[in-house]
């Protein structure tokens, strides 16, 4: 009898929860239509995985890619609509958030074809891999639109949990297990620090959790210049710092890049930075409105350390993935310049434009690493010597992406950095921009060193890995080449049409 009563209560409670969720989706679903499309795609993947004995692999890739493309389409149709706040103030939809959501969806869409051949060769579980990628994408999108401290904490946890699982996906690889352990420990510590900072904001504002209400609460309690706000700023900066991985919060980055599966590294290297940048701009710009001088100083220190340490240490690396890890630390220093400049002098527009170019440059380089690694089994920079003699397309596309990362004209990376530095110069960040220019010159050195190895034709310098290199038939690697071609085009041609791209970003944001 007691069991029946408990069972009935459980059913009633479950029904109430379901009806409440259905009510929220019914009245707020249009605000999160792109996210709902991804959720529907996740459900489809789970249904196919649980009902089909023999997995129809092309269908799994098709459903994942289609849900991402449909989500992008839904975002584009909603472009330039009036800002909306939904779910009792927890989620905000506006042009600024949607641009970052578009960038995250673009990253995921390019990463799936980049992963196809790698998954087939390493015999990784396909469905789970795609589920984790889509769920991480969903978490990143919710983080971009988060409008309160609870959602800002929960959404990155959704992203981070999937990231931990993806980084340790090759369970038999000792390096992958080591990378996952370090990533998990650092991620857990950063989340604890972040939520501690939010608790100081919560108390100082009189119990408010919405970003704008926190500002109003600080005004009402007269706590906006209190030591508690300074403590909150330090803890939140440290917490976000571990997500963005600028120096000195970069310790996990090289090991995770080196030990994780290469398609996973490609995915994490761009999506995590886009989502964390979107969150950082909103957190610093709204709740810490009265502490702008303090957080500007903190971010300037992080940017300087990142640009110097990232680019100098990258010179000494022998692993291609570790080199890109330190390069990404330097790149986030450039992005921080745009965050500091903010709305004034088109800082956000230049930051978003540079991140768009960075996605194509970085993913194009990782596509080369995936393709070369599958055919040679090595990641050592020296082993790339003479690749042009065996695979001219791979060598040339790699060279273009690396030159664009270094910021050489007339490629997209040059114009992206130029506009970002110009906005910083107009905002009076002379020392920061000077450091950025000097470290960009340093980065060109180690990128050109790799390109020289790729293009060498001396037999004595060509390693056995390249001598035994065999190109696979087009049918087997066309998915990687598709991603690479898209990334190479996006790393070169947009630089010529820089003004229209900046104009679109400015028109959309303001």
From Swiss-Prot:
<keyword id="KW-0520">NAD</keyword>
<dbReference type="GO" id="GO:0008137">
    <property type="term" value="F:NADH dehydrogenase (ubiquinone) activity"/>
</dbReference>
<feature type="transmembrane region" description="Helical">
    <location>
        <begin position="418"/>
        <end position="438"/>
    </location>
</feature>
<dbReference type="InterPro" id="IPR010096">
    <property type="entry name" value="NADH-Q_OxRdtase_suN/2"/>
</dbReference>
<feature type="transmembrane region" description="Helical">
    <location>
        <begin position="99"/>
        <end position="119"/>
    </location>
</feature>
<keyword id="KW-0793">Thylakoid</keyword>
<feature type="transmembrane region" description="Helical">
    <location>
        <begin position="124"/>
        <end position="144"/>
    </location>
</feature>
<dbReference type="InterPro" id="IPR001750">
    <property type="entry name" value="ND/Mrp_TM"/>
</dbReference>
<feature type="transmembrane region" description="Helical">
    <location>
        <begin position="484"/>
        <end position="504"/>
    </location>
</feature>
<feature type="transmembrane region" description="Helical">
    <location>
        <begin position="24"/>
        <end position="44"/>
    </location>
</feature>
<protein>
    <recommendedName>
        <fullName>NAD(P)H-quinone oxidoreductase subunit 2 A, chloroplastic</fullName>
        <ecNumber>7.1.1.-</ecNumber>
    </recommendedName>
</protein>
<feature type="transmembrane region" description="Helical">
    <location>
        <begin position="323"/>
        <end position="343"/>
    </location>
</feature>
<comment type="subunit">
    <text>NDH is composed of at least 16 different subunits, 5 of which are encoded in the nucleus.</text>
</comment>
<dbReference type="GO" id="GO:0019684">
    <property type="term" value="P:photosynthesis, light reaction"/>
</dbReference>
<keyword id="KW-0150">Chloroplast</keyword>
<feature type="transmembrane region" description="Helical">
    <location>
        <begin position="295"/>
        <end position="315"/>
    </location>
</feature>
<keyword id="KW-0472">Membrane</keyword>
<feature type="transmembrane region" description="Helical">
    <location>
        <begin position="395"/>
        <end position="415"/>
    </location>
</feature>
<keyword id="KW-0618">Plastoquinone</keyword>
<feature type="transmembrane region" description="Helical">
    <location>
        <begin position="150"/>
        <end position="170"/>
    </location>
</feature>
<keyword id="KW-1133">Transmembrane helix</keyword>
<keyword id="KW-1278">Translocase</keyword>
<feature type="transmembrane region" description="Helical">
    <location>
        <begin position="183"/>
        <end position="203"/>
    </location>
</feature>
<feature type="transmembrane region" description="Helical">
    <location>
        <begin position="229"/>
        <end position="249"/>
    </location>
</feature>
<comment type="function">
    <text>NDH shuttles electrons from NAD(P)H:plastoquinone, via FMN and iron-sulfur (Fe-S) centers, to quinones in the photosynthetic chain and possibly in a chloroplast respiratory chain. The immediate electron acceptor for the enzyme in this species is believed to be plastoquinone. Couples the redox reaction to proton translocation, and thus conserves the redox energy in a proton gradient.</text>
</comment>
<dbReference type="GO" id="GO:0042773">
    <property type="term" value="P:ATP synthesis coupled electron transport"/>
</dbReference>
<feature type="transmembrane region" description="Helical">
    <location>
        <begin position="347"/>
        <end position="367"/>
    </location>
</feature>
<dbReference type="GO" id="GO:0048038">
    <property type="term" value="F:quinone binding"/>
</dbReference>
<keyword id="KW-0812">Transmembrane</keyword>
<dbReference type="GO" id="GO:0009535">
    <property type="term" value="C:chloroplast thylakoid membrane"/>
</dbReference>
<dbReference type="Pfam" id="PF19530">
    <property type="entry name" value="Ndh2_N"/>
</dbReference>
<dbReference type="InterPro" id="IPR045693">
    <property type="entry name" value="Ndh2_N"/>
</dbReference>
<keyword id="KW-0813">Transport</keyword>
<comment type="similarity">
    <text>Belongs to the complex I subunit 2 family.</text>
</comment>
<keyword id="KW-0874">Quinone</keyword>
<dbReference type="Pfam" id="PF00361">
    <property type="entry name" value="Proton_antipo_M"/>
</dbReference>
<keyword id="KW-0934">Plastid</keyword>
<feature type="transmembrane region" description="Helical">
    <location>
        <begin position="57"/>
        <end position="77"/>
    </location>
</feature>
<keyword id="KW-0521">NADP</keyword>
């Amino acid at each position: 009898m007691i069991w029946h009563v408990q069972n009935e209560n459980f059913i009633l409670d479950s029904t109430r929860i379901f009806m409440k969720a259905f009510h929220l989706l019914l009245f707020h679903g249009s605000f999160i239509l792109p996210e709902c499309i991804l959720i529907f795609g996740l459900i489809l993947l789970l249904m196919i995985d649980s009902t089909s004995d023999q997995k129809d692999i092309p269908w799994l890739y098709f459903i994942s890619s289609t849900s991402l493309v449909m989500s992008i389409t839904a975002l584009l149709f909603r472009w330039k609509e009036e800002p909306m706040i939904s779910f009792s103030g927890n989620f905000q939809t506006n042009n600024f958030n949607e641009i970052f959501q578009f960038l995250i969806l673009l990253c995921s869409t390019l990463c799936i074809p980049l992963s196809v051949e790698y998954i087939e060769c390493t015999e990784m579980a396909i469905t789970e891999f795609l589920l984790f990628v889509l769920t991480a994408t969903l978490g990143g999108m919710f983080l971009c639109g988060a409008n309160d401290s609870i959602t800002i904490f929960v959404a990155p946890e959704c992203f981070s949990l999937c990231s931990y699982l993806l980084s340790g996906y090759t369970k038999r690889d000792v390096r992958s297990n080591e990378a996952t352990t370090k990533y998990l420990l650092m991620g857990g510590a950063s989340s604890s620090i972040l939520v501690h900072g939010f608790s100081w904001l919560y108390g100082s504002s009189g119990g408010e959790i919405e970003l704008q209400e926190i500002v109003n609460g600080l005004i009402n309690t007269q706590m906006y210049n209190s030591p508690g706000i300074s403590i909150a700023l330090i803890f939140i900066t440290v917490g976000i710092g571990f997500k963005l991985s600028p120096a000195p919060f970069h310790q996990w980055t090289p090991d995770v890049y080196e030990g994780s599966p290469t398609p996973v590294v490609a995915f994490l290297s761009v999506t995590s930075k886009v989502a964390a940048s979107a969150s950082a701009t909103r957190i610093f710009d709204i709740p810490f409105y009265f502490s702008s001088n303090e957080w500007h100083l903190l971010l300037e220190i992080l940017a300087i350390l990142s640009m110097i340490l990232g680019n100098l240490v990258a010179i000494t690396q022998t692993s291609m993935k570790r080199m890109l890890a330190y390069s990404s630390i330097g790149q986030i220093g450039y992005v921080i310049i745009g965050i500091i400049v903010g709305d004034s002098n088109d800082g956000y527009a230049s930051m978003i434009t540079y991140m768009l170019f960075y996605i194509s440059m970085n993913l194009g380089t990782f596509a080369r690493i995936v393709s070369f690694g599958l055919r040679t089994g090595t990641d050592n920079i020296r082993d790339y010597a003479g690749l042009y003699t065996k695979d001219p397309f791979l060598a040339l596309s790699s060279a273009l992406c690396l030159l664009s990362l270094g910021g050489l004209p007339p490629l997209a990376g040059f114009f992206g950095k130029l506009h970002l530095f110009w906005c910083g110069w107009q905002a009076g960040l002379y020392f920061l921009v000077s450091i950025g220019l000097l470290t960009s010159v340093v980065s060109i050195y180690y990128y050109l060193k790799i390109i020289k190895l790729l293009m060498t034709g001396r037999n004595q310098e060509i390693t056995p890995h390249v001598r035994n290199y065999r190109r696979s038939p087009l049918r087997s690697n066309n998915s990687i080449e598709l991603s690479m071609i898209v990334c190479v085009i996006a790393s070169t041609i947009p630089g010529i049409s820089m003004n229209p791209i900046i104009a679109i970003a400015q028109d959309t944001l303001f």
